[in-house]
Curated annotation (Swiss-Prot):
Principal location class: nucleus
Name listed for the protein in its UniProt record: B3 domain-containing protein At5g54067
Domain of life the protein comes from: Eukaryota
A single GO cellular-component term on record: nucleus
DNA-binding region: 20-118
Keywords, alphabetical: DNA-binding, Nucleus, Transcription, Transcription regulation
Gene3D superfamilies reported in the protein's UniProt record: DNA-binding pseudobarrel domain
Record flagged with keyword Transmembrane helix: no
Amino acid sequence: MNYNDPLEPAMIITKVLSKSDIVGNVVLPKAEVMSVLTRMNVNDQDLLNGVEVQVDDIMEDDLYTVTLKVSGIDKPKYYFGTGWSTMKHSLDLSEGDVLKLYWSHLDNKFVVLNFQYSVLPLMIPV
């Protein structure tokens, strides 16, 4: 992924985490996931069984493997199952936090966009 190129808004998934997302599996916004799925090489049957995807935290240099699944046919719900618990604890996520992921179709993985910006103090020589 070239981090100097602008991000495609259609490849971003944003979710404000609820208590149930923290206690169990995180349910992802349907419209945003469906937009990302246009670039992933998966079909409905793959998602029913679960597809392992990588999630890259480039700030901490951590790579997570989570299972992206769908439940239900009439009203599908997309969620991260296996691997989500490890990822949420490592990212120190809690209720009310915003999870923001970018699907990098060239790298075939999600990239965490939850950057914690910090400013180094200005050092003035005396």
